[in-house]
């Protein structure tokens, strides 16, 4: 399993989404975060299994919530670029850089 580093803008995506779901329905943010944790485990175990959307960025489709997770593999580390709602403008996450 590879190490995962969640970059600051992806951390903000997660926080914003968790707050949204907490306001929408009690306990929904916990479900969202649990599914994200499962996604991180799957990506960590099989990072090359998920499709490239733009070299070197890969996409993981999150089940039960309308989100995609975008990441880059560099050496033995997986960097999470975005946890992005499907209806948001993809140009936002496409401008994100690893460094």
Regions of interest found by a model, annotated:
Residues 58-62:
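Short acidic-hydrophobic surface loop/beta-edge motif
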Residues 5, 66-68:
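Active-site phosphate/pyrophosphate-handling residues
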Residues 68, 72-99:
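Enriched for short, Lys/Arg-rich terminal
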Residues 1-57, 99:
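Basic, Lys/Arg-enriched alpha-helical interface segments
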Residues 42-43, 63, 72, 83:
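Conserved catalytic core of Hanks-type protein kinase domains
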């Amino acid at each position: 399993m590879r190490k995962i580093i969640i970059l600051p803008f992806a951390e903000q995506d997660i926080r914003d989404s968790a707050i949204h779901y907490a306001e929408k329905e009690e306990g929904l943010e916990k479900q969202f975060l649990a599914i994200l944790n499962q996604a991180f485990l799957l990506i960590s175990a099989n990072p090359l299994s998920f499709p490239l959307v733009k070299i070197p960025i890969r996409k993981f489709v999150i089940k039960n919530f309308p989100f995609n997770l975008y990441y880059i593999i560099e050496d033995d580390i997986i960097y999470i670029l975005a946890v992005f709602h499907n209806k948001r403008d993809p140009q936002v996450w496409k401008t994100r850089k690893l460094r």
